[in-house]
Amino acid sequence: LQIIGPREGVKKVASTHILQTRFGPLFLADTTVNHFLSPDDIADITELVAEQVETFNITPKIGLVTYSNFGSVPNGESAQLMRQATAIVHERHPDWIVDGEMQVHMALDPELRQKYYPFSKLGNHQVNPLIFPSLSSANIAYNLLGTAAGMDVIGPVMLGLKKPVHILQIGSSVRQ
């Protein structure tokens, strides 16, 4: 990060892991870079991930996830963080298919989301990036899904750098 540096206009670099799921590719962020995030940081990371998703000719349909659904926990720290980040993304990109804050199962289940939260901007779309409130939650999620569920995992893919970078994790196989 210090040698290559962020590309012009990027305030905070980030990373994503891509998992092959039964719904198609699922991008998780920020899985390896940023420890302490503000709502603006999360909005910036959301933009970087959306840009990466588009490089695969996929329209980003983004869920900002935490332990709360659309204000069900009004005073929780990470719920407030994700709610504020969602508002920033909505303001910057009113035409994007993005919503939050919501629990992961709500983000991944369009029927359930439509039933309980029909106002969601995600509508009946299948979410493809999930944006987490912290490095620890994103890192735990990708490791859990990759290890316990046996999903193929690509990454971390670094986002927002001047040049392409790929980092190998300890114990990476040749396939990874």
Residue ranges and their predicted role:
Residues 1-80, 84-124, 128-176:
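Anion-binding alpha/beta catalytic cores of soluble intermediary-metabolism enzymes, centered on
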